[in-house]
Regions:
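Hydrophobic/aromatic anchor residues within beta-strands of the central parallel beta-sheet
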Residues: 3, 66, 116-119
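C-terminal substrate-binding subdomain of Rossmann-fold SDR/epimerase-dehydratase oxidoreductases
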Residues: 144-239
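Active-site helix of classical SDR
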Residues: 93, 97-100
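NAD(P)H-binding glycine-rich loop region in Rossmannoid oxidoreductase-like domains
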Residues: 8-47
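Conserved Rossmann-fold NAD(P)-dependent oxidoreductase catalytic core, especially the SDR/UDP-sugar
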Residues: 29, 52-93
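NAD(P)-dependent short-chain dehydrogenase/reductase
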Residues: 103-158, 163-167, 171-172, 199-201
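Conserved catalytic-core motifs of eukaryotic protein kinase domains, centered on the activation segment
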Residues: 36-43, 77-82, 130
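Active-site beta-alpha turn of Rossmann-fold NAD(P)-dependent dehydrogenases/reductases
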Residues: 31, 67-71, 91, 120-122, ...
Length: 239
């Protein structure tokens, strides 16, 4: 693996970044600053133009194939099973910025032909996760031998996927050439947050009392949603 340094704050559109990065056949773009502060204006005011300028520079200079990480927050407050062909109604600055980036890149295809795969990520967990994420907090409570773990009511329904599987799916999506556009990267299995925590404890042979309802439910995401995996399965199974 060759690591090539790049600082977004020193971006210069006069530079040919496609050549700088060794003229890659495919780029998988995962970078995005400021998370998990989903409601910060930073996403639209700074991240959106910054990442659009960088990606279009690559494309203008010859990049033929681009895969970008999107987010389930592009669907907004819609509930139930979320499919890629549904209208998007992002309700927070992070979701709005990602949706705007996707739309602008799709418009850019009118000037420069390239393959665009937009991977909508749902809820990931595993090695390297944010220290303030649910399981990170739970692991700390267990390590500290705490008797009680404070959490929300736990009845919200989510779609969880191990980060290793998320990465595997992203690579499969990026390498194939049959399906472009938006692709959900999720399990397709709805589960309550309470069930998710209980299963995690069971798998790790751990016990701790769950103080349900200590935290309010987030107001920036719907109560019950999960992803449709029909399109993802076609990619993974080479259909």
């Amino acid at each position: 693996v060759t690591y090539i340094p790049f600082d977004f704050e020193r971006f210069d559109d006069r530079t040919d970044y496609y050549n700088y990065f060794g003229q890659p056949d495919i780029v998988i773009h995962l970078a995005w600053e400021g998370l998990p502060n989903y409601r910060s204006s930073f996403h639209e005011e700074i991240n959106l133009p910054r990442h659009y300028s960088f990606l279009t520079n690559l494309i203008k200079n010859g990049l033929p194939d681009l895969t970008v990480a999107g987010t389930c927050f592009e669907y907004g407050m819609q509930e139930g099973c979320l499919k890629e062909d549904m209208p998007v109604l992002p309700a927070n600055p992070y979701g709005k910025a990602k949706d705007s980036l996707r739309r602008r890149l799709e418009e850019f295809k009118g000037n420069y032909p390239f393959s665009l795969k937009w991977v909508r990520l749902f809820y990931m967990y595993g090695k390297g996760q944010n220290p303030n994420s649910l399981l990170s907090q739970l692991d700390r409570a267990l390590a500290n031998k705490e008797q009680v773990f404070n959490m929300s009511g736990g009845e919200q329904i989510r779609d969880f996927l191990p980060v290793e599987k998320v990465a595997e799916n992203i690579v499969s999506i990026a390498l194939q050439r049959n399906i472009d556009g938006v692709i959900n990267n999720c399990s397709g299995n709805p589960v309550t947050v309470k069930q998710f925590v209980e299963r995690y404890l069971q798998l790790n042979n751990k016990t701790i009392a769950l103080n349900l309802g200590f935290y309010p439910y987030p107001d920036y995401e719907p109560m019950k949603f999960w992803g449709d995996t029909s399109k993802l399965k076609k990619v993974v199974n080479n259909e």
